[in-house]
């Protein structure tokens, strides 16, 4: 599949979607995007910057949600033009899709909205590549009907993203079998290594996370075989305004990505045959 100006798939090297969870300021986004461009350029990784203008599903109603649509699009447009990288953001049911699609290169649907038929179709009808996150409550094989809805709009640029499955209260687990199962949708599969270590609502008024397991799950996913990796990162996760507990430190991204690219090359060298 053609994504931005590069090809993605199991016959292509791993690509990266990364950036801060939420747009905190113009300068932070430019700094992080610039550093990620430097790292990915050095390692030969195709890179898409991500950040959200509105986090509509925060645990607490008083938590920081972002700058909003107008200011958020200005920031994303600045990142795209000044840093020279494609950009991704997530959209919601109330989002003016065409307005967002005029700025960003890739649209993303939140996991909690994966079963909302009209929403999925409206996003995909905007004509941009779409990264559809699998709901924490959804079986991997149930992504096939979601993809069918998406492609019924005529948009063939659809990706599916694994971000963990609910496992009791305030906990997620990653079933690596789902990465193989979701290949049957015919779409590139992306693994979200940071939201997969989230502890939803685990801190009462906010979500917790187990950042130390990001490289564990990322390595496992790459070893199974994926097209892309999604990872939220921040210069100081302890001060991040959203999802800090599961964000990977920016100054440790290069070492993580270097390892993952080596694993990716080995995995894809040996193919993905199914065994009955």
From Swiss-Prot:
Which Pfam families does the UniProt entry name for this protein?
DAHP_synth_1 (PF00793)
Q: Tell me, what is an example of a GO biological process annotation in this record? A: keto-3-deoxy-D-manno-octulosonic acid biosynthetic process
Pathway participation: Carbohydrate biosynthesis; 3-deoxy-D-manno-octulosonate biosynthesis; 3-deoxy-D-manno-octulosonate from D-ribulose 5-phosphate: step 2/3; Bacterial outer membrane biogenesis; lipopolysaccharide biosynthesis
Quickly give the catalysed reaction.
D-arabinose 5-phosphate + phosphoenolpyruvate + H2O = 3-deoxy-alpha-D-manno-2-octulosonate-8-phosphate + phosphate
Q: Which residues form a coiled coil?
A: none
Q: What is its main location?
A: cytoplasm
* EC number(s) recorded for this UniProt protein: 2.5.1.55
Q: Which Gene Ontology cellular component terms are annotated?
A: cytosol
Residue ranges of the TM segments: none
Location in the cell reads: Cytoplasm
Query: What are the record keywords, sorted?
Result: Cytoplasm, Lipopolysaccharide biosynthesis, Transferase
Gene Ontology terms, MF aspect:
3-deoxy-8-phosphooctulonate synthase activity
Which Gene3D superfamilies would you find in this protein's record? Aldolase class I
**What top-level branch of life does the organism fall under?**
Bacteria
PANTHER family to which the protein is assigned, alphabetical = PHOSPHO-2-DEHYDRO-3-DEOXYHEPTONATE ALDOLASE
What family does the entry list? Belongs to the KdsA family.
Output the NCBIfam families linked to this UniProt entry: KDO8P_synth, PRK05198.1
HAMAP family, per database record: KDO8P_synth
Protein name from the UniProt record: 2-dehydro-3-deoxyphosphooctonate aldolase
- What organism is listed for this UniProt entry? Xanthomonas campestris pv. campestris (strain ATCC 33913 / DSM 3586 / NCPPB 528 / LMG 568 / P 25)
């Amino acid at each position: 599949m053609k994504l931005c100006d590069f090809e993605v798939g199991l016959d292509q090297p791993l690509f990266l979607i990364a950036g801060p969870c939420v747009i905190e300021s113009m300068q932070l986004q430019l700094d992080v995007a610039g550093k990620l461009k430097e790292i990915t350029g050095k390692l030969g990784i195709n890179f898409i910057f991500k950040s959200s203008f509105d986090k509509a599903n925060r645990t607490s109603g008083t938590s920081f949600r972002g700058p909003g649509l107008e200011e958020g699009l200005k920031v994303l447009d600045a990142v795209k033009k000044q840093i020279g990288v494609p950009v991704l953001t997530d959209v919601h049911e109330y989002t003016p899709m065409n307005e967002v699609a005029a700025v960003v290169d890739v649209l993303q649907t939140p996991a909690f909205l994966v079963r909302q038929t009209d929403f999925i179709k409206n996003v995909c009808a905007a004509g941009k590549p779409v990264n559809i996150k699998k709901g924490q409550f959804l079986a991997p094989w149930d992504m096939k009907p979601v993809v069918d809805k998406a492609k019924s709009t005529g948009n063939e640029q659809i990706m599916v993203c694994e971000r963990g499955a609910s496992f009791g209260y305030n906990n997620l687990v990653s079933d690596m079998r789902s990465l193989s199962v979701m290949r049957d949708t015919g779409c590139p599969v992306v693994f979200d290594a940071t939201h997969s270590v989230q502890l939803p609502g685990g801190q009462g008024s906010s979500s917790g996370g187990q950042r130390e397991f990001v490289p564990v799950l990322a390595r496992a996913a790459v070893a199974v075989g994926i097209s892309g990796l999604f990872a939220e990162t921040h210069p100081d996760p302890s001060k991040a305004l959203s999802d800090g507990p599961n964000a990977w430190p920016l100054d440790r991204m290069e070492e993580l990505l270097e390892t993952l690219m080596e694993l990716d090359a080995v995995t894809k060298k040996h193919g993905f045959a199914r065994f009955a």
